[in-house]
Curated annotation (Swiss-Prot):
It catalyses: L-serine(in) + Na(+)(in) = L-serine(out) + Na(+)(out); L-threonine(in) + Na(+)(in) = L-threonine(out) + Na(+)(out). Involved in the import of serine and threonine into the cell, with the concomitant import of sodium (symport system). Its main location: membrane. The keyword Transmembrane helix applies. It is a multi-pass membrane protein. Keywords: Amino-acid transport, Cell inner membrane, Cell membrane, Membrane, Symport, Transmembrane, Transmembrane helix, Transport. The chain crosses the membrane at residues 14-34, 44-64, 79-99, 138-158, 175-195, 214-234, 295-315, 327-347, 353-373. This is Serine/threonine transporter SstT. It comes from the Bacteria. It is found in: Cell inner membrane.
C-alpha cells in the first residue's frame, strides 16, 4: 500500500475535506490562474452527486417501501412536524433580526432573465404537476417530488410481489449505496476545486458592499443552527442536543456549504444516517423529503431580503404580517428546492405580498446573486444539516420511548 493510500485510510473524511478546503483557499490566494483551471474538479464532483442522487432516492425509497413489513413503524410524521416547526422558527428569527438590524439596499437594475412564480396558487399547481411527472422525466431532471411519488407507488405495488423480486430490489439498493460511497470519497478533491475556483473568480471584493446584509443573513442562520435547532432537538430527545447538532453540521453542513445544493447532499445525509444507526425505512424517505420541503435557510433568505427591500422603500409593516409573509414564502420555497440559488426566485412572490413591483423585486434578486457565494452556501448548509438532525432526533426520541 502506498503512503498516500495509507494516509487516506488513516484520516477521516471530514479531516480530508478540511485539508482540501485549506488547500483550495491557499491556491486561490497564491495562484488564481491555476485555481480557475481547477474548477472542473468541483464541477465533476457536484455533477456526480447530482447524477447519483435521483437514482439513489428512487431505488432506496422503493426498496424501503417494498420491503416494509406490516407492523413495522416509520417515524415520518414527527419528522414532518419538526421540519415545519424548524422552518417557522427560522422565519421568526429572520423577522426579529430584520426589525432589530434593518438592511438598506442600493438597488440596481438586473439583466438576468429569471422565471419567478406568479403567485402561491401557481407554486402549488407546479408542485402537484411535479408529483404526477413522467418517472423517466423525473429521474432525468432530478424532480424529487416526482421521484418520491413514483418510488412510493412502485414500492407499495411491489409489496405484493414474490420474495425473489423484493430481494432483487434490496440488492439494487445496496449496489447504488456502494456507488454513492465511492462518489463521497472524492469530496475532498471536489471541495478543493470548488473553493479554489470560486475564490479565484469572484474574490471577496463583490461581498464588501453588502457586509451588513450578509451579517444579518449569516447571523440568523448561525443562530438557528446553534440555538433554535438545538432547542427543538432538546425538546424532542430530552438530553444535551449539541453533540448531535455539531456532528450533523460537521458531517453534512460542510459538504452542503460547498456543493450549494440540498439535492446533491442527499447521498451524504443518507450515509450519515446509516452511520448513526437510524431506522432505514424512516431516513430513506425523510432525507430526500427534507431536501425538498425542509427550508429553514430559504425562510431566512426570503424574509431578510424581502424586508431589506421593504426598509429600503420605507414601507411600514407590522410584526404579524411579516411573520405571516415569511411562513407563506417559506412554504412556497419548496417549489425551488434542489436548485443552487432557488430560494432567490421566490423573493418576487414575497415582495408582491407587500405590493412591491416585480422590477424592484428582481433588483433584490440580483443583490441575492451577488452575495450568493456565501448566502446560498450557508443556506444550503443549514437546510441540509437540519434534514439529518431532525431525522436523527425523531428516531432517537422514538427509541427512548420504546426503551
Amino acid at each position: 500500500m502506498t503512503p498516500l493510500l495509507r494516509f487516506l485510510n488513516r484520516t477521516s473524511l471530514v479531516t480530508q475535506i478540511v485539508i482540501g478546503l485549506l488547500a483550495g483557499i491557499a491556491l486561490a490566494l497564491l495562484a488564481p490562474a491555476i485555481a480557475r483551471d481547477l474548477a472542473f474538479l468541483g464541477k465533476v464532483f457536484v455533477s456526480a452527486l447530482k447524477a447519483v442522487a435521483p437514482v439513489l432516492v428512487f431505488i432506496l425509497v422503493m426498496a424501503s417501501v417494498a420491503n416494509h413489513r406490516h407492523g413495522q413503524e416509520t417515524h415520518i410524521r414527527p419528522i414532518l412536524w419538526l421540519y415545519l416547526l424548524g422552518t417557522f422558527a427560522a422565519a421568526v428569527v429572520a423577522v426579529v433580526a430584520s426589525m432589530l438590524f434593518p438592511s438598506h439596499l442600493a438597488l440596481s437594475t438586473s439583466e438576468a432573465s429569471l422565471s419567478a412564480p406568479g403567485g402561491i396558487t401557481e407554486v402549488l399547481q407546479n408542485l402537484l404537476l411535479s408529483a404526477v411527472d413522467n418517472p423517466v422525466n423525473a429521474l432525468l431532471n432530478a424532480n424529487f417530488i416526482g421521484v418520491l411519488t413514483w418510488a412510493i407507488g412502485l414500492g407499495v405495488a411491489l409489496r405484493h410481489a414474490g420474495e425473489t423480486t423484493r430481494t432483487v430490489v434490496e440488492d439494487l439498493s445496496t449496489g447504488v449505496t456502494l456507488i454513492v460511497r465511492v462518489v463521497i470519497r472524492f469530496a475532498p478533491l471536489g471541495i478543493f476545486g470548488l473553493v479554489s475556483s470560486t475564490l479565484a473568480q469572484s474574490g471577496l471584493d463583490a461581498l464588501l458592499g453588502y457586509l451588513h446584509l450578509l451579517a444579518v443573513l449569516i447571523g440568523c442562520m448561525l443562530f438557528v443552527a446553534l440555538v433554535m435547532n438545538p432547542l427543538i432537538v432538546f425538546w424532542k430527545i430530552r438530553r444535551n442536543p449539541y453533540p448531535l447538532t455539531l456532528l450533523c453540521l460537521r458531517e453534512s453542513g460542510i459538504t452542503a456549504f460547498f456543493t450549494r445544493s440540498s439535492a446533491a447532499n442527499i447521498p451524504v445525509n443518507l450515509a450519515l444516517s446509516e452511520r448513526l444507526g437510524l431506522h432505514e425505512d424512516t431516513y430513506s424517505v425523510s432525507i430526500p423529503l427534507g431536501a425538498t420541503i425542509n427550508m429553514a435557510g430559504a425562510a431566512i433568505t426570503i424574509t431578510v431580503l424581502t424586508l431589506a427591500a421593504v426598509h429600503t422603500l420605507g414601507i411600514q409593516v407590522d410584526l404579524p404580517t411579516a411573520v405571516l409573509l415569511s411562513v407563506v414564502a417559506a412554504v412556497c420555497a419548496c417549489g425551488a428546492s434542489g436548485v443552487a440559488g432557488g430560494s432567490l426566485l421566490l423573493i418576487p412572490l414575497a415582495c408582491s405580498l407587500f405590493g412591491i413591483p416585480s422590477e424592484i423585486a428582481m433588483q433584490v434578486v440580483a443583490v441575492g446573486f451577488i452575495i450568493g457565494v456565501l448566502q446560498d452556501s450557508a443556506e444550503t448548509a443549514l437546510n441540509s444539516s437540519t434534514d439529518v438532525l431532525f431525522t436523527a432526533a425523531a428516531c432517537q426520541a422514538k427509541e427512548q420511548r420504546n426503551g
